[in-house]
Amino acid sequence: MKNTLLGIFSIFCVQLFAQNQPPAILNVSSAQNAKTVTYNFTLEDDENDVCTVELHVFKKSGSGFEPLTVNGITGDIGNNISTGTKAISVPLPSDGEYRINIVAYDGHSFDLQAIVDRVDTLHLYSDLKWLEGTRHRTAGAAKLKAVQDIIESLFTSLHYEPSIHTAKFGDYQLKNYIADHYGASSPGRILINDAHYDCVPFGPGADDNATGVAGMMEISRIIADYHFRKSIRFIGFDVEEDGLIGSKAYVGQGGLSVKDTIEGVLNFEMIGYYSDKPNSQTLPNGFNLLFPAQSAAIAADSYKGNFITNVRNSNSKGISDAFEKSATTYVPELKVVTLEVPGNGALTPDLLRSDHASFWTAGKPALMLTDGANFRNKNYHTANDRVDSLNMWFMGNVVKASIGALLEEANIIHGDVYSSDLQVLTAVDQLPGISVEIFPNPMNEILHITSQNAGNCTVDIQTLSGELIFNKKYDSEASGKIEIGTSKWPAATYLVKFETEQGTILRKIVKN
């Protein structure tokens, strides 16, 4: 027995350490002069594989990114880059705000099945138990606020780029919580995983829709450990139960950038109720006429509620096929019934009862992944919608199929990505009628700013990458002679903004 156990352990260790590790970009620093910015970094790879190194430049426009072609990039870039100390120099583009992505990968692949299998049903159950409770703006405001806080805290802790999209619904300000895991080379091509976090005012909302929120949270935790070509966006929608108000506002009131290409939405709408009992699944009126093959298959299986419903329209075939393929590949035990509704679903109102419909209206591909709501779960919108009525095995499999689709569609990278924001501004020396001197340059322990006729002013000092170092307002009396201590500032080039009512003076100051 001892030898057998030792052999099993040895095989496990060989398999564990045989997995090729992705390269890492470490110890990054940057130096900027009037013409270029140079990134110095260490490229490491546990197996000393040669790597491909890319550098991508994007112009930031609102919440979107516009790819920019920059000629003349030099240094350790391209194929067959060995490990060690590296440097890449980039000619500065015109004035504006930019995102610089350095990408390094070694040509190997991740074991996607192993990533899918990281979905933990005990974790899902724990999240569900915490989320369970009335989450409504009137009947359960305290619980709703607690759930909002936990979603925001999670998105922030995972080092995504979080934001909150707000809109008015009567006197209530709804909040859609967003986390962007931006893609390395195509950040404007976006996959979305969403779930609404509110529930009806008279129930604990375990299946509807704590299951969706817990599933989204689990995927966001796992996805955070990897890099992708495309972006993955997580959204917690507010006020779904009153008519998809949160998602309608997001789609129609500034949540989506016109520069974004939404390649697919996985909308979780009740993903935890499962029954293998005959006649546990009912169907909407007319279902057999619109979906005869699916209706016949459900009838042949004695109307068991043992499948996840994948609702799509014709515009959503790509993301639907990806979900079905993922289920077949990574979770073959998950039974999927796919329904393609005509147009945007006007003939099938029962299949428009979730946030995917807001995306359909906007022409974006989206799926509703659902256990069927009241057509299976008789606890729907009642006080009995509790966690202990749900099936963790089934829910876990839905989450696994979803994460598998995201891994494939967002193009996971077996490598590392370093992102840096860069601000390029041309210096402005003077304004008419105002005399300003900023000295010494290079600066020492004290930076002096003297002026005449400036009046009230604001001094703003930041690094060329946009990090704010100093900000202070001065009245007309104090603005004539300003002294700023700089002894603790690191060596770098800084942008000094001297803002007055007449305009802004920009100067670049160096500290050696």
Question: Where do the PLM segments sit?
Answer:
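Extracellular acidic, Ser/Thr/Pro-rich low-complexity tracts
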Residues: 42-49, 59, 453
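C-terminal outer-membrane/trafficking sorting elements
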Residues: 429-512
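A glycine-anchored, Pro-Gly-centered beta-turn/N-cap motif
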Residues: 82-84, 88, 96, 455, ...
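A non-catalytic alpha/beta surface segment that caps or lines the substrate-entry region
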Residues: 126-182, 336
